[in-house]
Curated annotation (Swiss-Prot):
Enzyme's top EC category: hydrolase
Name the record gives this protein: Kynureninase
EC number, as in UniProt: 3.7.1.3
UniProt-annotated binding residues for pyridoxal 5'-phosphate: L94, T95, F122, P123, S124, D125, D208, H211, Y233, W275, N303
Catalysed reactions listed for this entry: L-kynurenine + H2O = anthranilate + L-alanine + H(+); 3-hydroxy-L-kynurenine + H2O = 3-hydroxyanthranilate + L-alanine + H(+)
GO biological process: 'de novo' NAD biosynthetic process from L-tryptophan; anthranilate metabolic process; L-kynurenine catabolic process; L-tryptophan catabolic process to kynurenine; quinolinate biosynthetic process
């Protein structure tokens, strides 16, 4: 699917006239496209604000009152993550939710304090884990246990993850990995890793599902995941910086329903509490007694952004209409397999065993041996890292060429381009054109190299 480009947004250095033509957008892993109904949905809430102002909290002129605005979203979102309604909440943003969950679920002791996650994790996750160690007066160098890929490999092997857990089971407090790794595009074996770690009852297992939610089928409840969190602006298409979500397994819902003088504090799971997690029947009584709603809703803190919530709801209705993630995954696999096929046909594709750091081209760093190892995203690594006589990396030159020629993908330093065909709006033609322009970009680089050598 192409998206029109406004002429004022086209760089002056554009080769050829792209203005007014279509762009091939394979960047849903970074920001999903806006659903057609979203503008009308947002306008309806703006009208309610204009016409009713504060009264829309309880007497919305056309739709759900704002005091309950997030509640209709939960039944749409729960099937996407494979949770029960009471295990899911719409709230905050991804890192805010991760920090909130760590407050509740990271309970270190002198002997059991380590946090396990992958090397080269998304930086925001690293910062959250690092600061949890510091908050509990642990040395991050001893508290953080990162798992690296084997030498000359680009993704983690499940057996290596399990080995680290087994060897450190007496000192691990938390395992928290990404459902899909943001850089490599690797889809982790969530069920297998979770069940293995839970052989050791005191280990908590959480997942950052930023790149997995809305991308691949999830069954968090059945898999026994303790907690998970995600954003919604990638494959869930809710808009830039939009509201996130979290999952808390029902096995943790036994916490006391009251927190005050009359409660056994040992039954209460501490959290970053706020009035939106309180008993909604007493929320506006302004009592100095916290009675958290049972389940994930009890972890909410503040009233959510109405505009964010309705943007998410607009997109989730599309997922429901087309049979959910399981159904969309069938098309997604076809698109991504076609992408892999086209990349492997490229004259610049260098399989791992034949690749050279000095040879112009790319290799696929996403595990592609089995469809259970990847989602929509395929990551390619460009070589060589820098061209002689050029001030830019090879990846930057190729990325900019593709953008000038109407392909929107994204790049990650130092040398990776991520390509993600999304089943809700991408086509096989999008994929074909994207790889064709990638090849043209590398042709252009090759000509530049020859010109430099001849001078």
């Amino acid at each position: 699917m192409g998206i029109p480009v406004n002429s004022e947004n086209v760089n002056d250095e554009t080769e050829g006239d792209v203005a007014g033509k279509e762009v091939y957008y394979l960047c849903g892993n970074s920001l999903g496209l806006m659903p057609k109904d979203t503008k009308e949905t947002v306008t309806r809430e703006l009208d309610a604000w204009r016409d009713r102002a504060v009264e829309s909290h309880f007497k919305h002129p056309t739709d759900t009152s704002w005091v309950d605005i997030d509640l209709p979203v939960v039944p749409l979102l729960a099937p996407i993550v494979g949770g029960k309604n009471e295990e899911v909440a719409v709230m905050n943003t991804l890192t805010a939710n991760l920090n909130s969950l760590l407050v509740s679920f990271y309970r270190p002791t002198k002997k059991r304090f380590k946090i396990v996650f992958e090397k080269k994790a998304f930086p925001s996750d690293y910062y959250a884990f690092y600061n949890q160690c510091r908050l509990h007066n642990f040395d991050p160098n001893e508290c953080i246990l990162q798992i690296s890929a084997r030498p000359n490999e680009t993704f983690l092997r499940t057996e290596d993850i399990l080995k680290v857990i087994e060897e450190n089971n007496e000192s691990i407090a938390l395992v928290c990995l990404p459902g899909i790794q943001y850089y490599s595009g690797q889809l982790f074996e969530i069920e297998r890793i979770t069940k293995f770690a839970h052989q050791y009852p005191e280990i908590i297992v959480g997942w950052d599902l930023a790149h997995a939610v809305g991308n691949v089928p999830l069954k968090l409840h059945d898999w026994g995941v303790d907690f998970a969190c995600w954003c919604s602006y990638k494959y869930l298409n809710s808009g830039p910086g939009s509201i996130g979500g979290l999952f808390i397994h029902e096995k943790w819902h036994h916490s006391a329903l009251k927190f005050g003088d009359d409660v056994n504090h040992d039954e209460y799971r501490p959290r970053l509490a706020g009035w939106w997690g309180n008993n909604n029947e007493k929320r506006f009584q302004m009592l100095e007694k916290f009675e958290p709603i049972k389940g994930a809703l009890g972890f909410r803190q503040s009233n959510p952004s109405v505009l964010d919530v309705v943007c998410l709801q607009s997109s989730l209705k599309i997922f429901q209409k087309y049979g959910g993630v399981e159904n969309l995954r069938l098309k997604s696999l076809k698109l991504t397999k076609y992408l892999i096929n086209q990349l492997q046909k490229s004259p610049y594709y260098h399989p791992k065993k034949q690749s050279s750091k000095e040879e112009l081209g790319f290799r696929i760093i996403t595990p592609i041996q089995n469809e259970s190892q990847y989602g929509a995203q395929i990551s390619i690594q460009l070589t060589p890292s820098r061209l002689t006589g050029k001030n830019k990396d090879t990846m930057e030159i190729v990325f900019e060429y593709m953008h000038r020629h109407g392909v929107v993908v994204d790049e990650r330093k130092p040398n990776v381009i991520r390509i993600s065909p999304v089943p809700l709006y991408n086509t096989f033609q999008d994929v074909f054109t994207t790889v064709a322009i990638l090849n043209s970009a590398l042709d252009s680089v090759k000509k530049s190299i020859k010109a430099l050598k001849s001078n």
